[in-house]
């Protein structure tokens, strides 16, 4: 049994484009009992939430009481070439605008609590989460998994470097690189990365972590304390696929979101020894 229900939602952006999404809701969500919202951004970027995957499972978060928004912004597949072209080479523009537009539409619903929201994504979705962090403080927390951070550094180090050089010129990369906005970040972030990730090398996560602690608006204090968190898997790849590690992944995400969005503590996995 699913712990909730699934709805199709959509909005129309300023350029007249329709942005579709799925919204997974707990059964108890209502105008009398609005629920927190988790915006979950898919990877790819040439991808879609139309395909089911056990690894990126919204129902686990719905079971914890969140509504989970699964949007298909510009660059998503299944909506024609023009929809892809809207975001081609401009990752931080149309895709970001689409994500904010569909979020605006959903938080206007009476069954959603617009004061308790978070954003999350992996790979390209993590890139977008990083971009969101540097462009808005509307979310209480952001989770970024296996994410692109400094695009000038990423391009020549990924195992898909040949593809990347066809996707973006050096100038495009710098125009769309999240690391240039680190000084604007005032939202607590959970950074997750696997050391054996060759698609988005670990250097992206390490640099993001260092720059959050040194240059964001929530830097580490004299004792090294900061609301930002880093979950590191020394023997995992781009997805984090070992079942015990996938379990830890979800438990740490739940802990971080509960603290930052819901305002209470959930225990961390015993395996972390914390």
Regions found by a protein language model. Give the residues of each.
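Active-site-proximal cap/loop segments of hydrolase catalytic domains
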Residues: 70-274
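Non-catalytic accessory segments flanking enzyme active sites
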Residues: 1-33, 56-58, 63-64, 105, ...
